[in-house]
């Protein structure tokens, strides 16, 4: 015989209509009555109907009808942590509904994981899709929320760690780490180049009214126009065309080479001055040939002249100014012309110095 809610209530109401003596039994210990003489209420019957130790708790009440109902019902729950189930749509608690098959916590955790696996896969796929879209559009790090689902303690922590790992692995370099983007670095380099060129332009143009970019560019344009007008004015004053100016520049460049050769030839100089008492002043200017200084000093030693003071320059040409004194025991008379010819030959020139 199976009992459901309706048959159970009908059986209880039929017993109440009979008005038998057991309904007036003494109250159970710890009853709700203040004076201890009240009868058993319907709530007491419902909550104590499935208790294994109800005979002692009711204090000797004749419970033969209830024992029959308890014998026909299923045994009480085996786990002490399980409680009675309540139906939110029912007015009466059914203590026997919880006596059915219950799931062990490990089985419940595995069932929860099985149910949440499709949802987690869907979330991972959606996260990857959103990450790809963000990379295509140049977005930053992912801002998707992290959810934690119910179930076993170990399963929930593993699932939460897995979801966080998926969410954080799409964009390893986020804006939270302070790493600037490539567009920002390129913009900074562009602005730096622009500022450097504006500073260079500002240093070239003599007339700058203000220091902002617009004024610098405007003053530069006006200065270029002014230079163009000045060039036209000078061309009109000279009376030559630009083609003629180019021809003149070409002729000037070709003639400059000959002038340089003439300057080199005319720059050779050998001066010897006798100041008396064996003191001689020498001044030499010639092209800087290799070994010209050593050959000049050797020639002066051969002539018996001792250098007391000397200044040598080798920038473009070889130049030497020296003050010499006649050595003791040498020839007493050495003419200036002889000194000049000796220095001329020591510098690498043949013939005589005119």
UniProtKB/Swiss-Prot annotation:
GO terms for cellular component: cytoplasm; nucleus. The keyword Transcription applies. It is found in: Nucleus; Cytoplasm. Keywords: Cytoplasm, DNA-binding, Nucleus, Plant defense, Transcription, Transcription regulation. Residues 124-143 are annotated as: Disordered. Belongs to the bHLH protein family. Transcription factor involved in defense responses that functions downstream of RAC1 and upstream of PAL1 and WRKY19 genes. This is Transcription factor BHLH3. It comes from Oryza sativa subsp. japonica.
């Amino acid at each position: 015989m199976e009992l459901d809610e309706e048959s159970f209530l009908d059986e209880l109401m039929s017993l109440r209509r009979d008005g038998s003596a057991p309904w007036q039994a003494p109250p159970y210990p710890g009853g709700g009555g203040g004076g201890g003489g009240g009868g058993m209420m319907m709530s007491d019957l419902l909550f104590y109907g499935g208790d294994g130790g109800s005979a002692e708790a009711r204090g000797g009440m004749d419970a033969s009808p209830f024992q029959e109902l308890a014998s026909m019902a299923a045994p009480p729950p085996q786990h002490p942590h399980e409680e009675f189930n309540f139906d939110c749509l029912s007015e009466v608690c059914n203590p026997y509904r919880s006596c059915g098959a219950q799931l062990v916590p490990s089985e419940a955790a595995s069932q929860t994981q099985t149910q949440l696996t499709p949802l987690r896969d869907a979330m991972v796929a959606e996260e990857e899709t959103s990450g790809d879209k963000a990379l295509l559009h140049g977005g930053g790090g992912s801002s998707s929320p992290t959810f934690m689902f119910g179930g076993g303690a170990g399963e929930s922590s593993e699932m939460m760690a897995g979801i966080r790992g998926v969410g954080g692995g799409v964009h390893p370099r986020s804006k939270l780490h302070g790493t600037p983007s490539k567009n920002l670095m390129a913009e900074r380099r562009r602005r730096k180049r622009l500022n450097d060129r504006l500073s260079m332009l500002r240093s070239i143009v003599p007339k700058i009214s203000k220091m902002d970019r617009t004024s610098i560019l405007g003053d530069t344009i006006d200065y270029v126009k002014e230079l163009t007008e000045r060039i036209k004015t000078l061309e009109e004053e000279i009376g030559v065309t630009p083609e003629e100016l180019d021809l003149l520049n070409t002729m000037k460049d070709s003639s400059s080479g000959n002038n340089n050769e003439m300057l080199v030839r005319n720059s050779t100089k050998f001066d010897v001055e006798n100041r008396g008492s064996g003191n001689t002043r020498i001044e030499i200017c010639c092209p800087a040939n290799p070994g010209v200084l050593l050959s000049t000093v050797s020639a002066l030693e051969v002539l018996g002249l001792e250098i007391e003071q000397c200044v040598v320059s080798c920038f473009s040409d070889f130049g030497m100014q020296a003050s010499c004194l006649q050595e003791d025991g040498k020839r007493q008379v050495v003419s200036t012309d002889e000194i000049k010819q000796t220095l001329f030959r020591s510098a690498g020139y043949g013939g005589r110095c005119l």
